[in-house]
Amino acid sequence: MVSNPSSSTEVWINSKTSIKFPFEPYECQRIFMKNVIDVLDMKLDAALESPTGTGKTLSLLCSTLAWVQKLKESKPMDFATWQSSGAGGAEKTEDKLKNSFIPTIFYASRTHSQLEQVVHELNRTEYKWVKTTILGSREHFCINQKVKKIKESNRQAHVCRGLVSKRSCHYYNKFDALTTDKANEILEKGEAMDIEDFVKIGTQNSICPYFMSRQRSETAELILLPYNYIIDPKMRRRYKLDLKNSIVIFDEAHNLESICESNASAELSSTSIALCIEELKKVLALLVEEEENAREEADNETEAFGTQKIDLTKKLIENLRTEDLMALLEKVFTLEENFDKLFESDQLKSVPPLDGKASDGAILLETLANSGCDGNSVERFVDVLRDAISYLLSKNEEVSLTEKGDGMESVADFLLSIYSTHAQEVAAAVGDEHIKLADRVDPATVARNCKLYIRKDSGKLVIKYFCFQASISMRMLKMRGVRNVLLASGTLSPIQAFTYNMGLNFGAILENEHALKQVPVLTSIVTRGKHGGLVGSFQNRKNIEYVSDVGESLIRVMETTPQGVLVFFSSYSQMDELVEVWKKTKRGASDSPETFWEKMEKTKKIAVEPRAKEQLAAVRLRYTQGVSEPHGAALLAVCRGKVSEGIDFCDAESRAVIIVGIPYPPIHDERVVLKKMYLDDLMGRKDLTNEPQSSRDWYQMEAFRAVNQAIGRVLRHKNDFGTVVLIDTRYASAKPEMFPKWLRNTISRCDSNNCALKTARFFKERGHLIENSKSEYIKKQAKTCKSFRQVKSQSASNPKDDITDITLEDMFSPANMKIEKKEKIEPRPIKYDSSSSSVFSLPTNEDELKVKKWEQENDSQTNVSSSSDLNKRKYKAETPGNSSGQHVVSGSEPPKKRKMVLLTRETLPEKYQNALNIPTSELTKGMSLDNQKQFVATLKGYKATNMEWQEVFQRLHQIFIPDRPDLFISCSNILRSEDKMKYIRRSLGMKINY
């Protein structure tokens, strides 16, 4: 729905707070925003599940910004004082003032492309003037070619710091010379900016966009950033994020639990330790050599001993001294030796079926402390490593290409991760509240929530430290002074387990309904095929009867589903194995002429998700092109893969979502085995006040979270519709709360045959919607192809670029999907005729109703036998009342202009003309009471709530067809003039006659 911020609707949530929303919100949006306002008032946290397509992002932005605006108005003097402090003001402001000014909003999402969409949504609202910035790495922002040509992000950072310290970056120097007022003048556009906007402004003004965005974050009211910038202690430290008195929003938070655990985990190899030792030796040798050269220089320049002394440290990087390097080198040597001893000791136990050994996390802390690195010394340890890396890179012309500081970087990151997770204040936060504080501050308390795992590969050790408590990361945020944490997603279910594991103080847990009371989704659990029950176990992948039944089920659904079908498998290996069997196995009798795979390819254009990310754009393009073809397309993909998240499949692209099997995590994966071991250990502990989650429940929850995320592809907005097919009998025994609340009432069980019948009936009832979506999808594809051509033409300047290098984020990002602004055509004012019961007056006979241009039907085949074939085109002309059209083969030269047929009252079929003359007062005569109620509700909805004409068409179709098609056609008189022509054209297309 396109909205104009100037025409926003004021929504009162309670007696104190109103929200300016771009349009009249649906009930589910009101409920969502009320929950946000309530927890902000109470200074509590929230877990908010709302189905995809219900305006979750818009509701989050409008409600939080409205609440902050109200607070700002109540403290105008404090806010004005803070804002006038200028760049760096957040650091200079006294704590007392800091506590009194408005909270900063941190809006986090998984990827930068998702954040681009947040910017797009924000600019639809009246809150677009709020001072906003977006944070990202140099990889996204930097415009200095010396840095851009470097691929590794860590090296980019070190090279950038070196250029900045030497004043060798023109873009940074110009940024550094900017006054605060000038910077604000450059960046103030009257609306929020995404990364592309920052880079464009930076390039135009030769000013570093990376540092501009970071500086703006010091005084911004809304900061957009990826998850890990908030969760990862190293990133918080790097970007100097001040979380005190802030509101932190995690959008798309369904994966947040695993992300929190991952960011509190760490990995290091003995190879990295050995490389770190070699790099430290190299730095030490270079440093000693430089000191010797400095002494010789001093001896040559000074006649009297001691009369002129050179401060050697000023010739080197600040604080980098040979004695520090030698002490550090000794500690790393000891660490390498202690890890070898630990692996051979009985402190680690074997963990079948894994090859390595494991123990509680406390063993790692003990090993690090015995190596001279504990919580008190780690800061200095890491600082020396960082200085050594910068020094090594500053000598890059003198060192080999392999000596880039990667080993030192790995050791530094490992230590920071461990001790950021195990700082004493964190231990105090995550300890049980019923235990005395003195007993909670020991970092070993935190280590009980972690597992150390070491394995040996080809004689080299791999040390992994797994954190299995997401609450550690969340409570670390609260310890930093975060005021509220809001977790939102379309799929948080099963939500009770999710909220338990996050460990926050939830004031609201919402499982929201869909915007539509009757969700236009058909969900079928297929329990049986021709040969029996469908159980997608690992063993059944080799069972030819099971694989055949799954293949037959897919074919039947593909045959009865129009447009696009998404098929999700549990894993790449499952998908590959089943496809391989389908390609070899004949369908039906042994003498059947075609295999399962051949039949699928005849039914739909098939695309398969690749393992390599760089190949995904081409596969995505093949699928979208296939969807617009007569038989449609099917995309085979995997749960938790690149397709199941992060890509928006709208309307025609996801008429059916099929899930084959249940996507349980790999049972022999190291993290899975150790997580289950950790949960089993918790079940045996008697010192816990709350009953922990069992390993069985966690394992099932992980699977269904992936299922629900894939299911979310089927509905993307209020006018969307589709089917969900779950091919596995085990879904039938799942508890209802494992599925999203909005889906539960749509689920039924059936066998393969009945599933196909129900699917066919479902889409037959929505035939007119499907026809309309075809033309809409073609328009969308035209814009997408134009965007794709623009991206391709931009890359053509570099002969090394290839189409496979263009990512999905390039092709389908909000930036590339922007539509050129067209001249706005004001609709004719609507006149109300008091003599009639019509809501809108009938347009005059001179109002011409334009029929769509029929585009050239281009042959999609790429192999053309001769050039003359290229000139043979077919054109379709349509006359009023005959929607089938006639094919006319042209000569060798196509027409220069496309023909346009205009539809007027005079050119309509006679019966249509008669129907349009029926007074609107006749529409409800003889109508049943129920139909009258539905009719009135439809008119009110159309007039008051921006109901789409397609929905009006569908509702009126149910009332008047097949009994009174003349009244159905006459109903077009109650529509706005711009919708009336579409209504009549749809009626002609469906051959509604009498």
Swiss-Prot record:
Amino-acid positions noted as binding ATP in the UniProt annotation, renumbered to this chain: S50, P51, T52, G53, T54, G55, K56, T57
Motif (DEAH box): 251-254
Gene Ontology molecular functions: 4 iron, 4 sulfur cluster binding; ATP binding; ATP hydrolysis activity; DNA binding; DNA helicase activity; DNA polymerase binding; metal ion binding
Keyword entries, A-Z: 4Fe-4S, ATP-binding, DNA damage, DNA repair, DNA-binding, Helicase, Hydrolase, Iron, Iron-sulfur, Isomerase, Metal-binding, Nucleotide-binding, Nucleus
Coarse class of the protein's main subcellular location: nucleus
Keyword set includes Iron: yes
EC number: 5.6.2.-
Designated name of the protein: Regulator of telomere elongation helicase 1 homolog
